[in-house]
């Protein structure tokens, strides 16, 4: 039950120390409003990620299924890595990013939406597994709020750079450096989570 606690002690949302539910700051880590207006216990019941990881994976799966439905009979085409793949048109309409959507059609918002879309069964399977493994760990180490910021900023940055490379670096002889005409997937946010873990490990020894 999502219930507000008005008296007693709660666990600080940042450091895990016991604090008064109405304390202005945590005596251990200095966080302001450590009791989160009395909702800290209810929020902690959602997990270290405050339910963000299940939300991301569930939304990705739902959008993938909708993409398949919108693609009609085109989903069975191609080999193993394109098996059950939504059509390029469906991905474009749902918010795929890349040089074509961003620069040719002015769909700048796709740098935010593309990380929620996937281009095939194996694509979404591997990404969902990575998110489910990395997300809770990053949430525990950094806090749910910072984890959401890391995930979102990494996704936006990755797709923005890929789209920009597709617009300006097509002349390069190495295909991997030429960016993408159209692209989807949670790889950029996943690398953001992984980078956060690497940074935490290096900074704490």
Q: Could you say what each language-model-derived stretch is?
A:
Residues 7-23, 27-205:
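A detector for small-residue-rich transmembrane helices and their helix-helix packing motifs
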Residues 1-5:
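A broadly conserved sequence feature marking short terminus-proximal activation segments
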């Amino acid at each position: 039950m999502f219930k507000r606690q008005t008296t007693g002690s709660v666990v600080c949302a940042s450091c895990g120390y016991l604090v008064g539910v109405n304390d202005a700051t945590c005596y251990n880590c200095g966080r302001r409003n450590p009791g989160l207006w009395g909702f800290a216990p209810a929020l902690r019941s959602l997990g270290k990620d405050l339910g963000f990881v299940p939300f991301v994976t569930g939304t990705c799966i739902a959008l993938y299924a909708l993409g398949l439905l919108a693609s009609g009979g085109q989903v069975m085409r191609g080999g193993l890595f394109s098996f059950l793949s939504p059509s390029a048109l469906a991905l474009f309409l749902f918010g795929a990013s890349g040089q074509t959507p961003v620069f040719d059609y002015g769909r700048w918002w796709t740098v935010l939406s593309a990380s929620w879309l996937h281009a095939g069964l194996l694509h979404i399977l591997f990404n969902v597994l990575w998110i489910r493994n990395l997300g809770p760990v990053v949430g525990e180490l950094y806090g749910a709020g910072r984890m959401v910021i890391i995930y979102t900023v990494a996704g936006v940055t990755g797709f923005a750079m890929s789209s920009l490379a597709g617009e300006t670096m097509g002349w390069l002889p190495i295909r991997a450096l030429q960016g993408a005409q159209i692209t989807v997937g949670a790889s950029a946010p996943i690398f953001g989570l992984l980078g956060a873990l690497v940074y935490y490990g290096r900074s704490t020894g």
